[in-house]
Regions:
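Cytosolic regulatory protein-protein interaction regions
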Residues: 9-16, 38-187, 192-211, 215-216
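Noncatalytic carbohydrate-binding groove/subsite architecture in carbohydrate-active enzymes
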Residues: 25, 56, 239
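Secondary-structure junction/capping motif
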Residues: 2-5, 238-239
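Intrinsically disordered, low-complexity regulatory regions with latent secondary structure
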Residues: 200, 209-259
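A cross-taxonomic marker for long C-terminal extensions/tails that follow the last structured domain
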Residues: 25, 36, 62-66, 72, ...
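Aromatic- and glycine-enriched pocket-lining scaffold segments that form the walls
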Residues: 3, 10-37, 62
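TPR/TPR-like alpha-solenoid helical repeat scaffolds
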Residues: 16-23, 120-127, 225-234
């Protein structure tokens, strides 16, 4: 059972089929837009909900806090403007700074415990609250990396980027692994992290260990497609190529939805 199925199962009495469908639509719309470098179809709705602290049920059903998902939508909108040549470098950097501050506001409050409790409790049960907290943290780190990639002159070797990737890796280490774990529900997170990983990085070693733990399941579905993209990307970069993951997809005529 993946993360989405698990959360849907334990919250099925709290959500009508209509609300579940709307939540799934928002999830696909937002992350699907990042696949294409364009604005989500319902970006205005997410923006209004973000400004009014509206809830879409994304945390309860998909594992990531609504506010972080709304900001990923905003980053996708910013990328669309960049791709269309609608912003000067100065304006683009100003928007990046503004969104980075908005992401800061979604961080846990300072009065919360510093030590992170384990997702699997002493009696072998899953702490659902900690699972969604950690999932949100992972998406937040990935969102920061995605946002940084829009800065003119972006270089994945920059210390700030490498630090973010290491933080993401340490966050993912606490997510249960293997066929019964939740890695296959974090495809987008792994894609964004892997897109900036450098040869010999902690992330690469960690990712390969997670793929090994998944066994045959790691070659299936969105996770398997994501591993193929990263494998090609990393291999080409070893030969000096500096393209991105979208270039790999376009070069192979792939139009995967990796969520």
């Amino acid at each position: 059972m993946n993360l989405t199925q698990y959360l849907q199962h334990i919250s099925q009495n709290n959500h009508s089929p209509e609300s579940v469908n709307m939540t799934l639509t928002a999830w696909i719309d937002i992350l699907g837009a990042t696949m294409l470098g364009r604005a989500p179809q319902f970006a205005d709705t997410y923006r209004e909900k973000h400004l009014s602290n509206g809830i879409s049920g994304l945390r309860e059903l998909m594992g990531c806090d609504d506010r972080v998902m709304y900001l990923i939508s905003e980053i996708a909108c910013l990328e669309a403007l960049k791709n269309d040549g609608m912003l000067s470098d100065i304006d683009l950097c100003d928007h990046v700074k503004s969104l980075a501050h908005q992401i800061d506001l979604t961080e846990p409050s300072l009065d919360q415990p510093v030590a992170t409790p384990p997702i699997i409790t002493a009696d072998g049960q899953i702490d659902t609250r900690q699972l969604t907290n950690t999932t949100t943290d992972a998406f937040r780190f990935a969102a920061r990396i995605y946002l940084c990639s829009l800065v003119p002159g972006f270089d994945r070797h920059q210390p700030q980027v490498m630090e973010l990737l290491n933080k993401l890796t340490h966050c993912l280490e606490s997510i249960p692994a293997g066929p019964d774990g939740f890695d296959r529900s974090l495809v987008w997170v792994y894609l964004i992290g892997g897109s900036v990983a450098t040869s010999g990085s902690l992330f690469m070693r960690f990712f390969k260990s997670r793929c090994s733990a998944l066994g045959e399941a790691g070659a299936c579905g969105s996770f398997g497609r994501m591993t193929r993209i990263l494998g090609i990307l990393w291999g080409k970069r070893e030969d000096g190529w500096e393209g991105g993951w979208r270039d790999v997809m376009e070069g192979n005529s792939w139009d995967f939805l990796l969520i």
